[in-house]
Amino acid sequence: MYAMTFAVPPAFRRLTALASAVVFLGIAAAPAAAAESPADWMYSPRTISEIDLTLPPSSWKTLEEHPEDEYVPGTFAIAETDGTPGTAGPFTAPIEVGVRLKGGEFGSLRTLDQKAAFKIKFDAFVEGQTFLGLKKLTLNNMVEDPSMVHEVAAYEAFQALGVPSPHTGFAFLRVNGESFGLHLNIETLDKIALEKRFGPFLSPPQHLYEGEYGADVTPGKSDELEVDEGKKKAGEKGDLEALVAAVANPTPSFSAAVGPVADLDEMTRMWAVEKYSGQWDGYSGQTGEKQPNNYYLYSDPSGRFQMLPWGTDETWGKPIEFEALGGVLFNGCLGDTSCKATYRQALAGALATLNGLDLDDSVRCASERLRPWQDLEAAEKSPAHPERVPFSAGQIASAVASTRDFIADRPAELASFLGVAPPAPPPSQPCPPPTQRRDHEAPPAPGGSTAPSTISASAPPGSIAPPRLIRSRVGERAVHLRVAVSGAGELVLYGWIGAGKKHANACAPARRRASASASTEITCKLTDPALRRRAKHRLRLHLKLDFLPSSGTPQEIRSNLTLSRHRG
């Protein structure tokens, strides 16, 4: 028979935006559409939070001497605002984090005397710690973009075309009480972000490769693709090897060879947005001489790749030709009749979708929301560190105007390339208000290494208490959970199995209505009992239990489930 033991992991997190309670190790087996997450409130262009970092002298010195080499200890706290300075709510309790500077040597890297960009790692020094389910925060300094809205508009365009891409918000940053000004709080592309969009990350064969300057899917250049998620050793990157081989030998055609290992429909949509937005510093290039840069390659469980954008601060500046050569995948597509037709369809889709999206209003409204914070940045400018405010109000206004001119002209330029009539611009709309602080007093506290296995009654007013696992039982064909909830709603149970290096779906999603009047049993029917039997001595079973309440703010808990086989 199987005995069940629970190893409580370091972090238990409260959830405030997702109607979910996760029991056991694992992330949502979600469809391709991004699932909600407790950190979603941070990642809206209408959200402006305030972040306080504290660095001891030793950490400050290390960042001055070795800015990108390592994470140094610091503390982190964040507060929501109503979108304008002076409206911040209570800050979260400070937590220990790792901090390093961010940026490339020839790009946005700045020192602490300047407007530095930062990476914050929540589990750098506290094992298993997360904040709102996140392991990292990425704070871009926007020093390459005086308008401070290029990235927001670019990712909005990618998302409108169905290209998986990071969400963004803004944060006003202070370090040791000194102003570092407005930063773009951009969603870090890591396993957590991928699982929101694509479901459980099973490695191998899944990977996330980062494509920095010059890296491409050709022999000699594919080694420059950095493995950000997934197995890194030689022989464990078969997905990338298959893609490189297909590109090198496109027989009988590029589409026929590359299509099985690359989602060319998705990639052509990404390239269409790159060209539309003038992203000369991306994958598809501008002249044929520009090296690929600022992209990710994500391989799904079958080893098929999608391409994800990154580093879009150089968009909306100058138009680039729609068929200017770039990376080898883009070039190969243009040389293939079928793929080129797909790309032109993607361009036509970009013309219709992005014109209707009214990016001009998005840019105008974002710049209006940021203006009071830019004024605050200027007001808090330190005479000792003037470079922490790199742009004047006039430079910002000029950059915003140039961005809007680009957006206004681009539909006609693309229509001319496609040989169609230019679309009429959409009517201007009033700007929506900034995101307001939520009803409770502050964002929820992060997970910590000493939290109990259930959340205490310190939840915000009006929230739903976390579902409570009463008991669990493993049968020959199913896992049975009995759960108590504090309100009416629906339970949804997903599961998958990891046995050594083998992974498989454990069960089909199960749904049950639940209420506070009685506990509810929900069953995960195993789809592969043979894999379970092959485990012999132990088995790791990952279950995700969502609780979708009729009302209120739900919570989240996590733990590990280990099954051990005993005789007797």
Where are these regions (language model features)?
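Bacterial N-terminal signal peptides that target proteins for export
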Residues: Y2-A19
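Bacterial N-terminal signal peptides
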Residues: T16-A28
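Polybasic, low-complexity, intrinsically disordered segments
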Residues: A34-A35, D405, S416-F417, P422-G568
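Conserved NTP-binding catalytic cores of kinases and kinase-like/nucleotidyltransferase enzymes
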Residues: A35-M148, V152-E156, G214
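Middle-to-C-terminal accessory/interaction subdomains
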Residues: D40-W41, R46-E50, S59, A234-A451
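Short, solvent-exposed loop/turn and secondary-structure capping segments
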Residues: L63-H66, S108-R110, F131-G133, H150-E151, ...
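Internal "kinase-insert"/substrate-recognition segments embedded within catalytic cores
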Residues: A117-E127, L134, T138-V143, L161-P166, ...
